[in-house]
Amino acid sequence: KAQRLNQRPDLRVEDIRGNVDTRLQKLDDGNYEAIILAESGLKRLGLVERITHVIDRSIMIPAVGQGALGIECREDDAHVRQVLAHLNDSETFVTVTAERAMLRSLRAGCLAPVGAFGQVVDGKLQLQGVVLSGMGDQRVDAKAEIALAELSESEQANAANTLGQTIAEDLIRQGATELISEARDNA
């Protein structure tokens, strides 16, 4: 909401509740002129035909971990952990690790107006983060990258955590803590 209002303060943006089918039905019933849903979710549900426009990441940075799937299992079940290890996508793991480290370092929750996008390009982990006021009239951004080449998997995870913390520190220096507090107080 905050990112949309930051770009288009002339819009009336409302929250919408329910699962994807419920939200689409509300759109079809004329309750809304448009709705914004995660592209990855619509694709996963086989609803690609409902996508009419994809908002570029330069306009709206996704929520932390957007589009990534996680699998949980018992920590003490070595066999299941070994089976699941083959499902792990190392690039997704390292990007989500960085994004979550940023969110954790900001002490922000899932409802805070915070966006993050990590990607691996040419052996470097790039991370972009944004924090906005609840109404989107104030915004702070940060981006950085770190080389992953020739690092072990655990070293890559440590590097991703460090990158997320670095981005958070930059955002905090720019006033992110106050923006998050203001958004939390007005929620």
Give residue spans per PLM region:
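Small-molecule-sensing regulatory modules
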Residues: 2-4, 8-187
